[in-house]
A protein has these predicted regions:
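S-adenosyl-L-methionine-dependent nucleic acid methyltransferase catalytic domains
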Residues: 1-152
Length: 152
């Protein structure tokens, strides 16, 4: 798949759809890499209702799950194995979340290196459907990313 190119990435992006599972485990003692931890702290300190009690915990568990996945993949793969990830930037209220940067850090910690990254402007986002978001930010400047990691 190393020679997939931008056109091949379009097909990969079109076939991807994800869902989130919410864990109720207490993950407050688990360390995250610096950029992930910084995001969780920003969400926890946000003035919006539920930021401290729910959303910061949800995001922490989500990021820990990504790290766990990257670590398990690394342990199951030989050096030079590839992992391809399609992910879209996101928002928490008025905070833009650069998911590509977070994934690079989480996968890097688990023994993966980014070999190539394609970024695509996203003309709209599902988060724009919520009427309450319009007061928080302008039209979505989000990007979707295809990251090709290699096991080091």
């Amino acid at each position: 798949m190393g020679a997939i190119g931008a056109a091949g990435c379009e097909g990969l992006r079109e076939r991807q759809i994800g869902s989130l599972l919410v864990s109720h485990e207490d993950s407050s003692r688990d360390d995250l890499p610096s950029k992930s931890e910084f995001l969780v702290k920003r969400i926890r300190r946000h003035r919006s209702k539920g930021s401290q009690s729910y959303y910061s915990k949800f995001v922490r568990n989500y990021l820990l799950g990504i790290r766990k996945t990257a670590t398990k993949l690394a342990s199951a793969c030989n050096p030079r194995a590839e992992a391809w990830v399609v992910i879209q930037d996101s928002w928490y209220k008025d905070l833009q979340i650069r998911t590509d940067v977070l994934l690079e850090e989480l996968f890097g910690e688990a023994g993966w290196s980014v070999r190539r990254k394609w970024s695509f402007k996203v003309p709209s986002s599902l988060s724009e459907l919520a009427a309450t978001t319009h007061g928080w930010r302008d039209k979505s400047p989000l990007e979707e990313h295809v990251l090709r990691f290699e096991r080091t």
